[in-house]
């Protein structure tokens, strides 16, 4: 009787451990997916702010010029 209970207990723990491992892999997949979504949303918001001029300082770097600097460029245009 004790042996039967012990065997059933061990089998039950094995099933729970397998279930736990399956849940861990599903959670890891979910966290990776959420990380990718957050990353892409951040990229979208950053690009959106450049296009619509929320930060003029960054726009100057993005487009390669500042109007108030009389055409000074952040990169070599070859005509200087």
Curated annotation (Swiss-Prot):
Annotated GO CC locations: extracellular region
Localization per Swiss-Prot or TrEMBL: Secreted
One of the GO BP terms on file: defense response to bacterium
Residues cleaved off as propeptide: 20-29, 54-80
Major localization listed first in the record, in broad terms: secreted
Cysteines joined through disulfide linkages: none
InterPro entries documented for this protein: Clavanin
Keyword field: Amidation, Antibiotic, Antimicrobial, Secreted, Signal
Post-translational modification Phenylalanine amide, affected residues: 52
Signal peptide interval: 1-19
Free-text function comment from the UniProt entry: Has antimicrobial activity.
Name by which UniProt lists this protein: Clavanin-E
Species assigned in the record: Styela clava (Sea squirt)
